[in-house]
C-alpha cells in the first residue's frame, strides 16, 4: 500500500537508503556480531527484490549521521545553526556535531563506536527489564521515582554505574566507555532487583545522560560559536527531560528538534540530498500521514468530554513521528482524579505513568513554568513544572512536571477550536493527550482501525463530525 502510494508520483530515478549497510557490517564484524554481519537478508538490495515494480532502479547509500543532521537542519528554517546528532549508532558514528551555514552542512566533531550515549541508555533500559530500542521513554518516566545519589558500597549509585561500565570523564573531550554495550548490561549490579532498585537505577541513568548531554552542548557551542540556533536530532533527542535542561545553556536561544528525530525521520535528510530546488524545506506541519477525511469532530468530542468520557479522535492526516498531536489521540478532561488510572488501563500501561497535556498556547504560562527560551512546545519535546498539580492529576508526573503540547490557531486550527470550546464550557484550557493505540500495537491509522479500536477497547472514536 505504501509503495503504491509512492508510485503515484512516478517511477523513482533512484532508491536512496539512510545508511551504508556495508560499512555497518564491517562494524558488526569488529564488534563480534558475526551472525548479524553475515546475514545478507537485511541488505536493502535483498529486501527490495520482493517488489518487482522497483526492478532495475539503482540503490544509493547515504551516511547515517548526515541524514539525521540534514533532516534537522533543512527543516529548521535556520540559515546558521549548530546541529547535534546523538543516537545508538550509525555505521560507526554515535555522536556528531555539524555546522549548518547558508544551506551547507559540515561535520566539526565525531565520536564513534563503542563510545555511545544512546547504547548506554538502551543497555540500561534492558537492565531494568524493559525492551531496548523501544522502552527508553519508560526509563525516563521511572527516573522521577528514584534516587540517583543513593549510596551503594560507599559511593553514589550513579558513580557505581559509571565505575562498572567504565564510563570515563575527560577534561578535553566527551565521555568514553571501556565496556562495549551493544549486547546490553544485564550483568550490572545483580543484587539490585526490587522495584525501588529499578527506579533508582533509572534515576542514575537519566542523571548520567543529562551530564553527558550538557558537555555535548557546551562542545557544540565551542565548535560552532557564531550562532544562537541549535538543532538536535537522533533518537536521543526524544529525551524531553534532558532537552529541558539545556534550553538556555551556553548561549543557544532557539532550539529546533524535528518532530521525528529518529531513524524514520532521517528519510527527509536522504531525500534532501537529491533536492536541487531549495535547501530550506519550509517545514509546515507534522501531519503528513494517512488522511481520514471529514470535518474535525469538534462537536461530538466536546459533548462526550463534557460528559466525562474518555474518547479517541482519528481525523485528518496522521502524525509523522512518535507523538500523537491531536489527529490520532486518546483524550479526556485532565481534572478527574481517576482519569489517569482509567486511561492507563485502556492503554495497558504501567500505572505510574502520567499523560501529556495539550493546552492553548496563550494559556500555557498560567499553568506551567516553561523552560527558559521555550515559548511554545507544539511537538511535546520539553517538560515543564505544573503550577497547579493537584488540579490536574492526569497530566502531572510524580516530580510535578508535564510533557507539554501547546496548540495555536496556525499549527492546528481545529484542535484549537476544540480546546477553546472546552475552555468556554469548563474554564480549563487543556485536555489529556496520548496516542490512540495500545502499548506495543500500531497507532490507529485509518477508519477501519478506528472502528476496531472502539470495538475492542470500548472507547468512542470519532473520525468526523
Per-range role (PLM):
Residues 13-14, 16, 82, 229, 231-232, 312:
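Structural motif
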Residues 19, 234, 259:
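Residues that line or immediately flank small-molecule/substrate-binding pockets and catalytic motifs
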Residues 59-62, 191, 195-211, 408, ...:
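Short acidic-aromatic active-site loops that bind/stabilize oxyanions
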Residues 15-27:
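Short loop/turn segments at strand-loop or loop-helix junctions that form parts
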Residues 229-238:
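Glycine-rich beta-strand-to-loop/alpha-helix junction loops that act as flexible
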Residues 203-228:
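Phosphate/ATP-binding catalytic cores across multiple sugar-kinase/actin-like superfamilies
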Residues 1-4, 8-10, 24-40, 45-61, ...:
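Flexible beta->alpha loop and helix N-cap segments adjacent to enzyme active/binding sites
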Amino acid at each position: 500500500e505504501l509503495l503504491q502510494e509512492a508510485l503515484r508520483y512516478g517511477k523513482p530515478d533512484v532508491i536512496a537508503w539512510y545508511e551504508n549497510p556495508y560499512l555497518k557490517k564491517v562494524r558488526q564484524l569488529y564488534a563480534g556480531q558475526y551472525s548479524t554481519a553475515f546475514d545478507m537478508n537485511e541488505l536493502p538490495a535483498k529486501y527490495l527484490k520482493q517488489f518487482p515494480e522497483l526492478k532495475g532502479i539503482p540503490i544509493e547509500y547515504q551516511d547515517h549521521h548526515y541524514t539525521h543532521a540534514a533532516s534537522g537542519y533543512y527543516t529548521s528554517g535556520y540559515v546558521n545553526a549548530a546541529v547535534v546528532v546523538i543516537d545508538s549508532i550509525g555505521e560507526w558514528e554515535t555522536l556528531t556535531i555539524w555546522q549548518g551555514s547558508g544551506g551547507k552542512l559540515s561535520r566539526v566533531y565525531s565520536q564513534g563506536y563503542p563510545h555511545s550515549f544512546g547504547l548506554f541508555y538502551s543497555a540500561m533500559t534492558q537492565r531494568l527489564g524493559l525492551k531496548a530500542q523501544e522502552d527508553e521513554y519508560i526509563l525516563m518516566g521511572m527516573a522521577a521515582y528514584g534516587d540517583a545519589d543513593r549510596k551503594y558500597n560507599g559511593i553514589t549509585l550513579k558513580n557505581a554505574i559509571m565505575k562498572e561500565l567504565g564510563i570515563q570523564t575527560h577534561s578535553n573531550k566527551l565521555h568514553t566507555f571501556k565496556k562495549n554495550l551493544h549486547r546490553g548490561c544485564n550483568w550490572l549490579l545483580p543484587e539490585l532487583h526490587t522495584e525501588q532498585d529499578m527506579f533508582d537505577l533509572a534515576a542514575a541513568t537519566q542523571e548520567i545522560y543529562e551530564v553527558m548531554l550538557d558537555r555535548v552542548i557546551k562542545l557544540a557551542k565551542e565548535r560552532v560559536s557564531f550562532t544562537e540556533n541549535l538543532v538536535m536530532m537522533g533518537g536521543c533527542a526524544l529525551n524531553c527531560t534532558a532537552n529541558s535542561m539545556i534550553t538556555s545553556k551556553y548561549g543557544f536561544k532557539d532550539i529546533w528538534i524535528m518532530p521525528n528525530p529518529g531513524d524514520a525521520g532521517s528519510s527527509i535528510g536522504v531525500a534532501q540530498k537529491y533536492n536541487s530546488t531549495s535547501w530550506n524545506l519550509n517545514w509546515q506541519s507534522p501531519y503528513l500521514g494517512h488522511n481520514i477525511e471529514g470535518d474535525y469532530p469538534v462537536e461530538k468530542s466536546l459533548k462526550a468530554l463534557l460528559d466525562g468520557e474518555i474518547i479517541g479522535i482519528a481525523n485528518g492526516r496522521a502524525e509523522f513521528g512518535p507523538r500523537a498531536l491531536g489527529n490520532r489521540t486518546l483524550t479526556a478532561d485532565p481534572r478527574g482524579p481517576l482519569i489517569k488510572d482509567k486511561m492507563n488501563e485502556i492503554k495497558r500501561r504501567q500505572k505510574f505513568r502520567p499523560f501529556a497535556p495539550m493546552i492553548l498556547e496563550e494559556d500555557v504560562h498560567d499553568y506551567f513554568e516553561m523552560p527558559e527560551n521555550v515559548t511554545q512546545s507544539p511537538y511535546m519535546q520539553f517538560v515543564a513544572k505544573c503550577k497547579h498539580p493537584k488540579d490536574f492529576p492526569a497530566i502531572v508526573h510524580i516530580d510535578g512536571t508535564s510533557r507539554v503540547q501547546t496548540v495555536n490557531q496556525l499549527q492546528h486550527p481545529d484542535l484549537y477550536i476544540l480546546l477553546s470550546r472546552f475552555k468556554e464550557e469548563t474554564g480549563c484550557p487543556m485536555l489529556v493527550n496520548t496516542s490512540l493505540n495500545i502499548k506495543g500495537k500500531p497507532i490507529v491509522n485509518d477508519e477501519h482501525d478506528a472502528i476496531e479500536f472502539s470495538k475492542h477497547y470500548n472507547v468512542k472514536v470519532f473520525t468526523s463530525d
